[in-house]
Amino acid sequence: MSMRTARLERSTSESSVLVEVNLDGTGKSEIETTVPFYNHMLTALSKHSLIDLRVKASGDTDIDVHHTVEDVAITLGEVLRTALGDKAGIRRFGEATIPLDEALAHAVVDVSGRPYLVHSGEPAGQEYHLIGGHFTGSLTRHVFEAITLHAQICLHMRVLAGRDPHHIVEAQFKAFARALRSAVESDPRVDGIPSTKGLL
């Protein structure tokens, strides 16, 4: 299998983003988004997916962090799609249930070429919590929406339990990381593209 790496720079009037990935890495990361809690989540995503990840981003965070957070997720989705190439030899599906103390999240990934997100189970009011001083709970869904759309993957994310807003978000990122790790891993028994259609 050839090197599964990708790099993309994306600039708008609202943000400037650079993302690099190596799907066959060891979970090394270099993250700077100017949003500390988001840095923490992306570092966890890299560590638990074993995808090497470099992110350098800046934006109009004096207005709101939303633009920078979403634009990083868009760019990350695009580099994941590019790094996957034709998806030959991958497992395609991945699933993980991950706890963080009282929080529990379940993620299922299908590298299907058809973007779709089902996101459920967050407790009422989670979207209004301000985490780490900048990151509102509502951004969690926005991040997963942007990644799934631009990576062209299907993701079912379900929060099964949780009380602490930080833990609820982090459990989701870690569950996504482990499910993604399984889905993008190469499987020596897979001959070609894992689809009866012959295309993903």
Curated annotation (Swiss-Prot):
<keyword id="KW-0028">Amino-acid biosynthesis</keyword>
<comment type="similarity">
    <text>Belongs to the imidazoleglycerol-phosphate dehydratase family.</text>
</comment>
<keyword id="KW-0456">Lyase</keyword>
<comment type="pathway">
    <text>Amino-acid biosynthesis; L-histidine biosynthesis; L-histidine from 5-phospho-alpha-D-ribose 1-diphosphate: step 6/9.</text>
</comment>
<keyword id="KW-0368">Histidine biosynthesis</keyword>
<dbReference type="GO" id="GO:0004424">
    <property type="term" value="F:imidazoleglycerol-phosphate dehydratase activity"/>
</dbReference>
<dbReference type="GO" id="GO:0000105">
    <property type="term" value="P:L-histidine biosynthetic process"/>
</dbReference>
<protein>
    <recommendedName>
        <fullName>Imidazoleglycerol-phosphate dehydratase</fullName>
        <ecNumber>4.2.1.19</ecNumber>
    </recommendedName>
</protein>
<dbReference type="InterPro" id="IPR038494">
    <property type="entry name" value="IGPD_sf"/>
</dbReference>
<dbReference type="InterPro" id="IPR020565">
    <property type="entry name" value="ImidazoleglycerP_deHydtase_CS"/>
</dbReference>
<dbReference type="InterPro" id="IPR020568">
    <property type="entry name" value="Ribosomal_Su5_D2-typ_SF"/>
</dbReference>
<dbReference type="Pfam" id="PF00475">
    <property type="entry name" value="IGPD"/>
</dbReference>
<dbReference type="GO" id="GO:0005737">
    <property type="term" value="C:cytoplasm"/>
</dbReference>
<dbReference type="InterPro" id="IPR000807">
    <property type="entry name" value="ImidazoleglycerolP_deHydtase"/>
</dbReference>
<keyword id="KW-0963">Cytoplasm</keyword>
